[in-house]
């Protein structure tokens, strides 16, 4: 899933709902290093064409699963931020699909065809599979052709996108039409 358009939508939603971009600097994440570690693990597992290495399949799978564990941990540690529980739920759906399908995210051939993709076997963290385990959690839909860097996506990706948009807009101080969490404790 390519997150840049989702971040842009989150910032636009924040502005439209009265938020300010400067408020994003006030957000304090717990264990942000886990987020950066997850990105590094993904880059090691699935290097771009400009990087001078190729990870062996077993190592790439272990690094990829490790990156998901780091990301889920970041979400759990920061669940107090509005919207992050939604994104974390999406990560858990994706992780469940990956773990029950041999360490790779299955993509339905029909979705790949609709996205203009064609590969057999394993490509980065995806594997073409017409009958995967947890079929509703796998990459089953294709982004429209007009979406930059369009690809296939899953129910987990949808939840991640919604959660990221809500988190960014809320962090900007937007007036969200969602119930605020009540403080607990004695007065």
Where are these regions (language model features)?
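Structural signal for the C-terminal ends of transmembrane alpha-helices
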Residues: 12-22, 74-82, 166-175
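A cytosolic-side transmembrane-helix exit/cap motif
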Residues: 53-56, 82-87, 104-114
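Transmembrane alpha-helical insertion/packing segments
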Residues: 1-67
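Membrane-interface loop-to-helix entry segments
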Residues: 59-66, 150-162
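Short, charged juxtamembrane terminal tails flanking transmembrane helices
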Residues: 180-187
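Interfacial segments of alpha-helical transmembrane regions
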Residues: 67-101
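Extracytosolic (periplasmic/ER-lumenal) interhelical loops and adjacent juxtamembrane/interface segments
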Residues: 107-152
């Amino acid at each position: 899933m390519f997150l840049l358009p989702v971040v842009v939508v989150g910032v636009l939603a924040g502005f439209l709902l009265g938020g300010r971009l400067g408020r994003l600097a006030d957000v304090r994440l717990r264990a942000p290093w886990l987020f950066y570690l997850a990105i590094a693990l993904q880059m090691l597992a699935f290097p771009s064409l400009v990087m001078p290495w190729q990870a062996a399949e077993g190592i790439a799978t272990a690094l990829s699963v490790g990156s998901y564990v780091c990301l889920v941990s970041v979400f759990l540690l920061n669940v107090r931020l509005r919207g992050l529980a939604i994104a974390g739920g999406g990560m858990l759906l994706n992780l469940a699909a990956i773990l029950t399908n041999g360490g790779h995210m299955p993509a339905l051939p029909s979705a790949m065809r609709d996205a203009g993709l064609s590969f057999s076997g394993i490509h980065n963290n995806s594997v073409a599979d017409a009958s995967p385990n947890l079929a509703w959690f796998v990459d089953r839909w294709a982004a429209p052709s007009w979406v930059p860097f369009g690809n296939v996506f899953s129910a987990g990706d949808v939840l991640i996108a919604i959660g990221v948009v809500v988190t960014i807009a809320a962090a900007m101080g937007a007036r969200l039409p969602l119930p605020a969490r009540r403080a607990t404790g004695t007065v």
